[in-house]
């Protein structure tokens, strides 16, 4: 063929191929339209009835990957709307020993990973899961900003949560609210989180509900407004929370606030015989909330607040038992005090907890009487009311050769069963002030839950070697 014929042949071939491609595309488009408009598919875009909204969404969009998250969101919204407020209808399960529940090894992993500096940790559950919580310092353990994180209050702290038994990292942590003191709890429908921030003489609390700010509370004594540092508890939507504002080494003003959906229903000043209240650890059962607190002013015995969330009233006293559970503390006396602080804490203390259930009562405390080291659980029947009650059983959680710290109670109120399983956590503090070869202060967490079996014990230390950080 001559050149002109070659050009004509090539052009004709291209036209034929292009025409075939267009026809294939038209056929493909027609098939797709036909498949999506077949009679068995409900393709209406109108708002589905509320009673079957999630099912309609799944039928319409189950095979569209880019819509999957929207479908899940709609399902979650409907489930949340249909959930009921949690009611504290059960009693505590019999406690014969404690089994391991969670451990995050945060400091060990933080030696070579982006783990956040935290303190004041706790555990809290909702109908779907339980998560670790803590106050972050806005830096990682290996970050240069970790220098000075021994200080409790700064603009860089936030309440974060992360999956159970994972370390808190910059990738898996969720910020709940901003502040240097906190509490958080779920009422069965949504979570309420409270964070306190600001200068010592002008701090304020912001109450979040369902991830939105709802209410604010201003300082009333202008001396470090503060709250529980562990989970609150809700009954039929009413969530009592204990706040203190005032001196840590003298008289302070404590209030119990009653919230519903983040809004204040009522507040009342502390009543009863407790003289000083800080950092309460609360649990709920049989339509009441019991909080074991810290008397930082005078008491080596712990004050207890018993709250009726239905009547929205409370009373307070001290644990009567001579088994003292604060730190520092003197040696256990022969007779305890029910309505007065037992002296010997030297204007100091540590957050702690107890489960006060008659003959099923267990108290937690550091093993050391002088420093935050070791941890043990002691069964002390009738400790709340008997001023001569003594331990009948015990379990070591952390040996006295290892550091401990704050501790607190929590329960999974949505777990199956005829009773509530008691649980607790222990903060394992590392770094300053005791380990001053490093510049930071942080912690890991170990948590345990009760068992009706008589289980063996083991040491559950933080486990990080400080020399690896030098």
Swiss-Prot record:
For the Virion surface compartment, the record's topological domain ranges are 28-470
Miscellaneous notes = The influenza A genome consist of 8 RNA segments. Genetic variation of hemagglutinin and/or neuraminidase genes results in the emergence of new influenza strains. The mechanism of variation can be the result of point mutations or the result of genetic reassortment between segments of two different strains.
HAMAP family documented for this protein: INFV_NRAM
Q: How is it modified after translation?
A: N-glycosylated.
- Give the source lineage, highest ranks first: Viruses, Riboviria, Orthornavirae, Negarnaviricota, Polyploviricotina
Please name the top-level EC class of this enzyme.
hydrolase
**Entry similarity comment:** Belongs to the glycosyl hydrolase 34 family.
Name used for this protein in its record: Neuraminidase
What biological process terms from GO does the record include?
carbohydrate metabolic process; viral budding from plasma membrane
Where does the record place the region Hypervariable stalk region?
36-89
